[in-house]
Swiss-Prot record:
Domain VWFA: 1705-1887
UniProt name for this protein: von Willebrand factor A domain-containing protein 8
GO molecular-function term, one example from the UniProt record: ATP hydrolysis activity
UniProt subunit comment: Monomer.
Amino acid sequence: MHSRILFKGTAAAVAARRIRHILGPLMSKEGWNCSAHEVKLLNTSSGDTVKIGEISYVLKTPKNPELVPVNHMMEALPQMVTQHLRWIMQKDLLGQDVFLIGPPGPLRRSIAMQYLELTKREVEYVALSRDTTETDLKQRREIRSGTAFYIDQCAVRAATEGRILVLEGLEKAERNVLPVLNNLLENREMQLEDGRFLMSAHRYDKLLEEHTKEELDAWKIVRVSEDFRVIALGLPVPRYKGNPLDPPLRSRFQARDIYYLPFKDQLEHLYRIGANVSAERVSQLLSFATTLCSQESASLSLPDFPVDNLPSALTVLNLFPMLSVQQLVQRLYPYEAMLGKEGRTAVEGVLNRFELTDGSTKPSPTAVVNIEPVNGGQAEQAAVTLNITNQKITFQVPSGTRPIRPPNSSPTFINTPTHERLLAEMMQSHLVKDICLIGAKGCGKSVIAREFAEMLGYSIEPVMLYQDMTARDLLQQRYTLPNGDTAWRASPLVTAAQEGKLVLLDGIHRVNLGTLAVLSRLLHDRELDLYDGTRLLRFDRYQALKEELQLTDQQLQDRSIFPIHPSFRIIALAEPPVIGSTTQQWLNPEILTMFLFHTIKPLAKAEETAVLQGMIPNVPGEAVEQLQHLTHSLRKSNDPTALSLASSLSTRQLLRICRRLSQYPQESVAHAVHKACLSRFLPSLARSSLEKSLANCSIEDHPDPASEQKQLYTCTVKDGLLTIGNVSAPVYSPDEKMKVPDVLFYENVQHMMVMQDMLKDFLLGEHLLLVGNQGVGKNKIVDRFLHLMNRPREYLQLHRDTTVQTLTLQPSVRDGIIIYEDSPLVKAVKMGHILVIDEADKAPTNVTCILKALVESGEMILADGRRIVSDALEAAGRPNAIPMHPDFRMIVLANRPGFPFLGNDFFGALGDIFSCHAVDNPKPQAEFAMLKQYGPDVPDAVLQKLVAAFGELRAMADQGTITYPYSTREVVNIVKHLQKFPDEGLANVVRNVFDFDSYNKDMREVLISALHKHGIPIGAKPTSVHLAKELPLPDCKMTGYWTISQGGNTRRKLLCPTETHRIDIKGPVFLRVQSYPSKRHESRSLSFTEEQAHWQIPMNEVNIVCDVTTAKDSIYVATCNPVSLYAMKEKGDSVQCIELYDIFPRTISGVWQPFVSVAALGNPLQDQVVLHEEQGNTVLHLDLVTGAVRRLILSQDKQDEAPRKTSNWWNSKESQPGYKMCKEFAHKNWLLFYKENGNQLDVVDVLEGQVHTIHLPINLKAVFLVAEDRWLLVESKTDRKFLLTKPMHMGAEETGVCQLHAISEDAVSSGFGNNSGMEAVSPQEVSSDQLSNENLSAALGQKIVSPNRILCDTNTYANVIVGFPDLMSPNELYSFRRSLPITESRRPDMFFGSSKRTGPAKRVNCVCLLDANQVVRALPPTQVPLAEVYPKDVTPPMSAAYLEVTDLNSKRLKYIPVPRSNSMSPYTVWISKVSDTDVVMAPLGSGGVVTVDMGGYVRLWETGLDHLQRSLLEWRNMIGSEDGRPVQITIERDSGLDVSSPKHGKIDAKNAPHVGGNQWAGGTGGRDTAGLGGKGGPYRLDAGHKVYQISQAEKDAVPDEVKRAARDMAEQAFKQRLKEIEMSEYDASTYDRFSGAVRRQVQSLRIILDSLQAKGKERQWLRNQALGELDDAKIIDGLTGEKSIYKRRGELEPELGSPQQKPKRLRVLADVSGSMYRFNGVDGRLERSMEAVCMVMEALESYEHKFKYDITGHSGDGFDIELVRCDKVPKNNKERLKVLKTMHAHSQFCMSGDYTLEGTEHAIRELAHEEADEHFVIVLSDANLERYGISPDRFARVLTSNPQVNAFAIFIGSLGDQADRLQKTLPAGRSFVAMDTKEIPQILQQIFTSTMLSSA
């Protein structure tokens, strides 16, 4: 088992080795030179001789005996070691240099030292690291009293003095450093920097024969001693990490494999140590260790077991024989923390094999019971008593120099059983070795280490490690003395070693292993050689040396030899290695040998609660409970997303949350969690996962408090007290006023909330971290915050090249002395200022992590040897300590993590030591208010548009549709521009922001569509005004009179009795008011038309719109299948909907189709409407705010009527009479109801709650409320008209009687009273108010003042009745006649042929706009003179209707087409009953109408002329008045200059036009003389002629033939490309259908992949270069004149032996089952899946090295249908189309059935076997899981069955809420439901961006 060697030697060598092992002890001496050798020391006259076996070596007396290693020999030398020593002696006698190679551990060094001790040789030891340079080996310059001179370094010293040079860690040194030694090794020659030349002893002695020593000295030749040898120690590199040996270097060494000691020797050694432990356990332990070091375990990539640490483990076991071996193994080899699943199973298997799994049965120590100091002896010791299974065992451990503190006496440390046990275990390890604590960030490593130190009376020396730390930073740094001499300063680590402190190496996982290697000798042997030649020895060796040489301490110190204090110990703190990642495997075999490891497990729930409540006694208990529930549910999850969230909720973060809740108990826990996780900037998956976890733990997410407490967010400074919102703090009075920032800041609610939050945390003493997109005002908020608090600030901006040095001190050279200037950080710490660190994410996280020590412990070591300490008392006694000012705080600003900022993940690395605040763009209202302050003169409409458009763009950026997050900064810049140059158009100014994207086609499309949607006419020209064509209106003629009868006898007859009773109200019932977002599009984005805006109501396709009405700025739409009401604001962005199908059942015994009218009530009943169902005469009153529905029952006698016979109003031949509602005066809260052919009117006063019923002597056809007290009635059958006058107030007069007057109509020709008059026509619409006098005069073409009404009927465009209804004299009727009357029937229907309907449509669609003097009707295209509207060769557009606008002011007629709806209800006949056209219409404001078509599309139109003119002006302003004049550059000169060349020119007396000619004044288009439109003239001079000007458009235009040529060229290339891939044009267009649909997602994915690739290729600093930028760390070396003191950026080659970057592995599992094909017609699911597959193929094209993907299908035929193989991905469009065709064909012809579950299981299983960086499975399925009897939790189990494989499922939504239910049961962030199949590509993009790319 031990014969495995680490080189692939020849088979023969292996065999020989094995046989030697087996036969070694039996063979005779000469057989193998391997018999038992002995080491003898012989004293002879010629000096002492050492004999090993038969080889002897004569000792020489060392010149410097203190440099000879002492105390290294083992008591009993194992045979193996003796053989190694004998071999080294052979090589030494031959004068060869040796290389001891072998696995990591101290054995090789120990053998070398033993040999040197044996042969009494002086040693020069160098630990090579990646920072070693040539100067460390040869010569270093130092400055003494102003001159630089050279000091020999180890190699030169060893060569000249005849010492042995021990080089350890050859694989660590950078390439090309060691070849410096090549010549010294080979020929023992070397040229030195100071001009001397080392020459081998042999040659030197030859020269001496010819020359004198003086001559050689003059030639600067130095003799190399013949005793000089090199012993190199190194690791074999292909197996371990490091640089391989240079072949020329390798050839100069003789190698010897130093493997672990043989089993037998090792066993004997362990038996001696662990006398109390049963022999069997010792041998099992050793067998276990040896197994893990074997070649086989290396192939499993398990790191080697640190065999060399077994003795220390046995020391512990010897004291505590009852301990569990398995737990000890964990300390030596923490396999659970560092290995993946396979590795863990392998290790546990071996443990079982050797019966070592006794972790559960054997006890572990439970607590430290007592600690007391032990007196006597030189070293401080403490007796520690541990409690283990109720036995108390006491043992002695080293202790510190401070007084010992008994356990459990610390006020700040809350003890929990876990921690007590951990401390007890650490005591055991402390007995033998240094400790390393492994635990996640924020779990209390530092706290435990400090508690441990205090218990043992240690002083702590924290050493913060960072990534680009060098070996010098760890051990010794150079500095200059005041006189300019260079000197070395020991690092804190070294001083701590001498003083016996406890060093905390914080962040050992960050530092480079090549640097850490310099500590291995300190950790293993407690010895250290420093750069200036100082040596530190282990205490016992130092004592031995002192006694042997009889020297005093002082003498030894003069020879720079110092002891290491026996109490000195190191505790390393590290985060666990990331299992499976390639980067962070810091726990390698080398480090395993250095420490004993203790992992800190996350606390159990009860213990953590105890800690939280112990630390913060007054925190609300319920909050803690909720937090704990959430945190532990996240930690227990095996979902990587959940675990990453859990890491944000570390114990430290929980303590912070609790501290805050204890101060502000009214805050919600959800808010705190969102803040801690920074949920605003999480990828969408993680955010949904977090929200789901919060919901599962029933943590309520309270609504945004901003809406509730608007009035609270103000800030005031009063009597030295600052109040923000409801938090107050005293204002600071600083010494330095000038450093307090003062900034232009406009307050808004949202920023005040952030500041209030910041103030809360600030008062709690937290350091703050503000994270947000660019330009959201982080800097402004902070400056404003500090301004309000009156705190001075120091400002530090980080960038890519920030180093730890620049963060703390800036070195500079002055007069040859290095001066350190304090950075803002140090100043802020000293003075108590606030340090603002900007752009923190730009600096590498390894740099910024030094802030951690500063925040956490308030300690930090500066480059010049000073240190910051938190405790002022501690600083008092120490000269170089800077006490941290109590007022010092840090505020860090960073951009949001992740794409597109590409910063470093500052939040991920350091987020939990700051209190985090997400800063977002202000909410629309807040942003609007703020912009208003920046641009007070910019019109509100423009600001609203900007705010809305940018709001939408930001939402898109959050979803990942666009990559750049547009911020407030951009909008503010636009507004500032508009404020200063108001004439520039908005459309032009926004280009300042969007021109960045003008070359990216997809991006440009998205932007333009978003801007157009909000009415920013980017791209429109001032000429694109497309208003409808105007036609002349026929002349206005007086056509007749209306006379109101006054006859006395008829008057009595026509009195109408009225009665009044209360309304019977049933209800209310409360229905849900649902709010849907409306995608409101401004229509005037590219051209100016009458249409203002349009949007779609979210209604079902089969629903039918049957009425629309408006009130102020609200629009109400009623639909009748099912009955629902939609309400929206004219400018709003949401639609409220109440569905009333519970109240109107679909049928009452038959096919009953409801038909609804709606009336909007006025003040004080705003937002309330009355719905009237015309058949059942149901009247409902709805409150749209509360959702209350009440039924108003009008007549008492109607209720007991028998149910009517069933009918449906669109089938019966005889139209069933319906009930009608007149709503002209609904805004006054009264309505009138009547029944067709009935003879009574019901007047409902909604406010009073009364009904007045009026009985009439006639049967009604129609009622028009022409005034509040005068109503026009039309009699049915005869169409005769009557005027009903009523007293103004019902019931005010006793009579309460209404009078009815008949109206006679007369034609113009005959005289009065002649009843032969005109035939009676029923009017369609009569206005309820009169035209203003100007409008009336304009309409009739004569000045006139009179009451009037507009009346519309089918024969005329409009009629004006002058004098009606107030004057009793005959009223004149003026008409604008039509040539053809409007017919009332629709054309035969396209689908259903000519289903004739009887009677007119229900909706007349005629509106009178009195202010605009217009009548607007909606007409079907058949009724429109299209030939006159459109030119001959233009085909009229397909339209739903035309709006006919009759303008009585301009006497013009316009026809405006209303675009067709996208979707049409199948119930065409029913629709034809509603309206003659496909729209219904209502007036909107005073100059416009709103139309709603049958597809539910709402359009707003502006028809009034003055409205249109005003809008056109605004629109032109928005485009900007680029009037085509060339821009002139004018330089105004002072008059003193000679202006001769431009002249005024001659004045022509005749003033004839002159064009050009450089002669006449007042010309046009010339040069040099004054005139218009020319160039170079002195000024403009207009002589009144037409200006000849080339139009700007013409100048800019590209000639047509050029355009044509370009188009042909593109087409040619396209065809050529198709030909190459043999694709037909039809195929190309088919493929384009799929690829075009996902082009945008593909684009954005590729952008992200590219940038990731770029980020991965980011260059690193290469140090020790001969050119580049000066490296701060090397300034002193620069002073002394060294060459390689520069650093430059370069590609860092990956270290050899570091694992290869493997590609990520993706499998897409597409559903190609029959149902996909079957339901494709419904929602296009198959096509969407094909698009998704197309997207994967296109996005990952040419990234095959990073993503290996394949695509398989699952259907009823099986679960593994191959579509794309990962080794044969489609290369071009043809191959991709083939894949898509296969999918389509398969789903068309496959069996039914569902294999989603099996397919997913199979894919996950198969992928897990493959080698990859990460594994992803994405399942697309329309699985109706319940139908196939699959329970969702089974599916959930499959998705998470293998933690290595990230599986996601996208369900194509199916019936009802099934998909949502499914999503609730499946793990969060793992399953998506695409109810709308268009979302599939977006979801896929989300998955890609948030997971694959998080770690790429």
